[in-house]
Amino acid sequence: MDWLEATGPLWFALFLITTFFNGRAAFKLLVDWKGMLTTCRFVEDAYAALDALPDEAVLEHAPEAPVFVHLVPAWYEPRIAGTLTALLGSRYPHNRLHVVVATREEEERSPHPRMETTTAELVRRFRDTLPPWQQKMLTVVMAPAATGHKAHQLNWALRPETLQTLLGGDHDPARVYVGVSDADSLPDRNTHRWLAADVLAGRGRRAYQGVTLSLANFERLDHRGRVCAIQQSSIFIRVSIARLINEVRRVAWFARLAARRPRLAAWVRPLFELGFRRSQICLGHHQFVRLDTLRALGGFPTEGATEDSTLGYALGARGILMGALPMLELVDLPETTDKMVRQNARWYKGVLDDVGFLTRAWRGAPTPFNLAQLLRHVGNKVVEWPIAAVVYPVVGF
């Protein structure tokens, strides 16, 4: 009893600490649940209203309908034909949709021993089987060796000479959207049609991120892989897309407050940006950025291992709000432990690289928003991800 009484303050402090973390976990669970409901409702409403979207004939004769340059970076991709079939089957005027496959020169020099030929040659063979009007929609470019890998491939596909061939010399970059899909993506055929309808309705944004589900190869995964596929897909639903939807709502709410109470808004703006703004998440596929915006950013970021996360931070630093795209896209989850480890290592390398980007952004513009992005990134990813890397193997994943 003497020992218990002597250590009472210690146990009380431990009780407070565990109560805090349990409360935090319960709050995060509630937020995630609300995020899942928000995204699911957003997607369900969009699919229920598909019949109200303008069809191909209307979009073909609408002068304000956007033009899409849809990029597919590829490297050793034997099953790329499935992605190209899905993209070329989009319900959008074929003269306003251009699919560009960007391969690497390294693959030509070192073909994969298990592939019958290179990815570029597979695409060319696939194109030869298409009708003439679809052949015109599909282009193949080969990026030389350089740092940046995927980002370099994407930027190479957007060179002026390539765009001039696709769009002509008098194209308006504000009416051109650059889409990105992985070589294992299966996008919904109504994706471009939904985006065009949003633009024509006056709601068009400079960038969009769509709902992605890592379920394309679900049947080929073992039980652990299926759990990871469901978990990763749930993160996209309850966090990534929900955050985009709610961020637009929060900023719109604050704009209304500023219009009604400008003095109050000016006083609380730093607190709002520091405590209530959230980072925008780009996933690297099923994303669209307006060409003029992408050019203003200097193209896809090449300084980090993950150009997608850096792109989201760069858009946020410039005050550009991304729109959520409700159409679904299925992608593969790595099917082997080796591929999964390499994917996660690349992601974490990108997390570390983004620390430098966010630090430079904050030093260049020391705003509460940029400070919040840096602090949250360090706390939520740089610190929590290594902990997860230790905990998951212990529990069997």
Language-model segments: residues:
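Cell-envelope/extracellular polymer assembly enzymes that use nucleotide-activated donors
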Residues: 66-69, 98, 310
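Short aromatic/hydrophobic "clamp" motif used to bind/position activated sugar donors
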Residues: 178
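Catalytic donor-sugar/metal-binding loop of nucleotide-sugar-dependent glycosyltransferases
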Residues: 303, 312-330
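Long helical/loop segments within the catalytic core of UDP-sugar-dependent glycosyltransferases
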Residues: 127, 131-133, 149-167, 189-304, ...
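Active-site-proximal specificity loops/subdomain of glycosyltransferases
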Residues: 110-175
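Short, acidic, metal-binding catalytic loop of nucleotide-sugar glycosyltransferases
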Residues: 85-96, 106
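N-terminal membrane-anchoring/stem segments of glycan-assembly enzymes
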Residues: 1-60, 269, 380-387, 391
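A conserved hydrophobic helix/loop-capping motif in glycosyltransferases and polysaccharide synthases
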Residues: 68-76, 90, 102-104
